[in-house]
Amino acid sequence: MDEIWFAGIDLGGTTIKLAFINQYGEIQHKWEVPTDKTGDTITVTIAKTIDSKLDELQKPKHIIKYIGMGAPGPVDMAAGVVYETVNLGWKNYALKNHLETETGIPAVIENDANIAALGEMWKGAGDGAKDVILVTLGTGVGGGIIANGEIVHGINGAGGEIGHICSIPEGGAPCNCGKTGCIETIASATGIVRIAKEKIANAKKTTRLKATEQLSARDVFEAAGENDEIALEVVDYVAKHLGLVLGNLASSLNPSKIVLGGGVSRAGELLRSKVEKTFRKCAFPRAAQAADISIAALGNDAGVIGGAWIAKNEWLKHQNC
């Protein structure tokens, strides 16, 4: 039997991650290319790099049955249209049509956090569970909600925008979405750095963070791991707000798995345990009892694996027609 591969693509602000993945969710080859931040040549770049990689591997193009791609922002999955991606200047952008035209391969488009959630459900910390919440903590905060094995899209593609749940109703920091006080302004890497700088400026206690040039969220968690008081205050504050948001979500959705992903989640147990403490306090007891909170297992591969999952499902639908 001929090999069957799917192309999983995760469009990020800095890089486009790509992988050829078989029908069992096993990565055969993976690589990345820089993102054109104007958004103008992204599909051309993807088409060229897929062709180039297939040539390098001496594989025929027909081995790739379908492409599954994740893009930032709300997506009309049926039409394959990205409603808006601010960083790339896209508005009502027909990504599916452009991608299929350039590659000659059928494609399906989904929100980037949603494909990460599907990847973790299929092959990662979701462990095959059908009711999963993934929150991605990176430069921003994204989210994917899976209910009964299906991504929650909502009426116009805005389902799962966990990063824009209001955490501070009055006096919160401004968010890229135009509101203030979103959890993204607190639990993202940029939010953590902002909070740390505010605490350092007002601190009477000594802290190693004062001497850190180009302060990062990683610096904050490393200092907290060494019991730096200011760093611990920052982590406690972040975990408290994130635990509250996740507790409210769990009370509404009753998931079996809550997965923390993205670069900030590399803080590991230090972050997870503190988030869980507030979560258990805030969630409806029966919902809290049912939910396991864990760190994402797939790292940067979650998106491409989730992309392959939706690609495989679309391909199977057409096989059964």
Swiss-Prot record:
<keyword id="KW-0808">Transferase</keyword>
<dbReference type="GO" id="GO:0005737">
    <property type="term" value="C:cytoplasm"/>
</dbReference>
<keyword id="KW-0418">Kinase</keyword>
<dbReference type="GO" id="GO:0005524">
    <property type="term" value="F:ATP binding"/>
</dbReference>
<dbReference type="InterPro" id="IPR049874">
    <property type="entry name" value="ROK_cs"/>
</dbReference>
<protein>
    <recommendedName>
        <fullName>Glucokinase</fullName>
        <ecNumber>2.7.1.2</ecNumber>
    </recommendedName>
</protein>
<dbReference type="GO" id="GO:0006096">
    <property type="term" value="P:glycolytic process"/>
</dbReference>
<dbReference type="InterPro" id="IPR043129">
    <property type="entry name" value="ATPase_NBD"/>
</dbReference>
<keyword id="KW-0324">Glycolysis</keyword>
<keyword id="KW-0963">Cytoplasm</keyword>
<keyword id="KW-0547">Nucleotide-binding</keyword>
<comment type="function">
    <text>An ATP-dependent kinase that phosphorylates glucose to make glucose-6-phosphate, not active on fructose, galactose or mannose. Restores glucose kinase activity in E.coli glk mutants.</text>
</comment>
<dbReference type="InterPro" id="IPR000600">
    <property type="entry name" value="ROK"/>
</dbReference>
<dbReference type="InterPro" id="IPR004654">
    <property type="entry name" value="ROK_glcA"/>
</dbReference>
<dbReference type="GO" id="GO:0004340">
    <property type="term" value="F:glucokinase activity"/>
</dbReference>
<comment type="similarity">
    <text>Belongs to the ROK (NagC/XylR) family.</text>
</comment>
<dbReference type="Pfam" id="PF00480">
    <property type="entry name" value="ROK"/>
</dbReference>
<keyword id="KW-0067">ATP-binding</keyword>
<feature type="binding site">
    <location>
        <begin position="8"/>
        <end position="14"/>
    </location>
    <ligand>
        <name>ATP</name>
    </ligand>
</feature>
